[in-house]
Amino acid sequence: MSIAVDHTLSDVVTRWLAAFEGALAAADGTALAALLAPDTHWRDLLALTWHITTVSGVQPVVDALLQHGAGTAAGSGANPAANPAARPTGCVIDLQRTPPRKVMRAGAPCIEAFFRFETSHLRAQGLLRLHPEAAAGGRHQAWTLLTAADEIKGYEEITGSRRPHGESYSREFQGPNWLDKRRAAVAYADHDPEVLVVGGGHAGLSIAARLRHLNVDTLIVDREARIGDNWRSRYHALTLHNQVQVNHLPYLPFPASWPTYIPKDKLANWFEAYVESLELNFWTRTEFVGGLYDDATGRWAVTLRLADGSSRTLRPRHVVMATGVSGIANVPELPVLKSFGGAVMHSSQYRDAAAWQGRDVMVIGTGTSGHDIAQDLHSNGAHVTLVQRSPTLVVNIEPAAQLPYAVYSEGIATEDCDTIAASLPLALARQSHRLMALQAAAMDQQLIADLTRKGFRIDTADVYGWQFKYLTRGGGYYFNVGCSNLIVEGKVGLKQFSDIEAFNAQGACLRGGDQVPADLVVLATGYQGMDVLVRQLFGEAIAKRTGPVWGIDEARQELRNMWQPTGQPGLWFIAGSFAQCRIYSKFLALQIKARQVGLIA
């Protein structure tokens, strides 16, 4: 969709950018402060700080900009420690992006504009939001400012005009051809990868593709037998719960004919095609056993268990953990189950609903997996009871659950949507999601009332909605794709775990004396955090040095240890949604490349 250029807005933005660049060149803190609104926020994605960081408030933002992005000229607030190499120059509206426009963000009107600039080492992009009304003196002030690295000068992605020529294998008829070279590259018979990516899901593929395009030698290892099996092996009816336009992988978008909600097997097959098309190095049936870091050499010694049972040691400089927000199954000790005579499995082990046709199944846990498994079992003829342990947020998959992705339906390029998504600082993201949570509750008022009447406990304590539940705990919500309706209609039973006194050989004994029969109990009890996996694979010392992974660091206003250096050199993490991994894989890859070429020690 083409958006007409509003020349008045463009003039406002151009004047602000010129004043901003001039104030930084002069290291003039007073002039900078005049450009910022009292409620201002600056988020930097490597462009000026080589970090992912957010700063809020006029004086903190001024101080940070002077520290990282000011020139060395004398001026009001001149900072002798300023780094002229990071000073933005050539700040102009990016004519290749969505033109400046008036929009609503976090419930407030603003002027939103994409711009581009350079530093000594980087080409970069930015997103500016100005309050729509001019302040005293007629100058518009910045509400939010995003600065984000795009590419390292001299080390650009090998795409387009920089694509490989192919001469080495197309004109040397007696030498190895393309396939020979690919096989040798994947084998690592005589060298180690620069980067080892652990996990071949969307997170691992995203970072490996980014690094491949930066000419960084990267190997993905995954314990599954086939690329995509992390999706292919899940329960039969699974589809993605957000829409196709949000879920593209880097460089290779899904075809325009694909369904809105992608089936698991279709996605799994796409993963295989993606690896082949982008020439990603991938070892299947390979388990990452653990790793030790050598501070003297700056390399890891990682142990891999191969398909034939043998071990292989590799020595990469970087290990990227791409095993997901949820890694190790959380199997709680439930004493009441000790006397149960039937089968018990964790939701991660659940595969085949048809095997339980006509039989009684109890699913413990009311998050997404619990609901989906209950619905899958019911659809295949099982008699299902869902057991709730704690209050759960429920939203209809359409339209309420899709509200956080509304920007991807504004008719603008995915790249622009990604920049907008990355530009909201934590405070405004919370405000935005609080408003969306209220809107979703209004949309789903009837569903919530019906579930409450059936005895389902709705989580109303968290006012920021499902996405902040994901960012803080990785779950605790359900997108209703039909199971809630089955509960309301009485087709799927509902019990509270607190009402279960004990289990016997036949099922659950309730405190009131009733019996709920069960041949199978599925524990949809979630997963342990990545901290547990780090401790298991790398040991206590490295886990302690690394620190907590995932969840929000309130002081920094960022996710903890995601997409950026951790306390352990050479250990990185990437996780989250398809959109998060598409967006932040770029910045993780740039940080690794900058270290490889010596821009960062």
Q: Which residues make up each language-model segment?
A:
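Flavin (primarily FAD) cofactor-binding/catalytic cores of flavoenzymes
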Residues: A148, G160, V216, V221-R223, ...
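Short, low-complexity N-terminal intrinsically disordered segments enriched in polar/charged residues
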Residues: M1-P38, R182-P193
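A short, basic/flexible loop-to-alpha-helix module at the beginning of a structural domain
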Residues: S168-P193, M345-Q357
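N-terminal Rossmann-like FAD-binding beta1-loop-alpha1 element of flavoenzymes
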Residues: A187-I220, S369-H378
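Short beta-strand edge/turn micro-motifs at domain boundaries
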Residues: S2, F114-R183
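Glycine-rich active-site loop/strand segments that organize a redox cofactor
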Residues: R232-N269, P391-G455
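N-terminal Rossmann-like dinucleotide/flavin-binding domain of flavoprotein oxidoreductases
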Residues: V58-A73, G90-E118, L240-A307, R473-G493
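A solvent-exposed, acidic/Ser-Thr-rich amphipathic alpha-helical stretch
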Residues: V12, G22, A26-N79, N83-G107
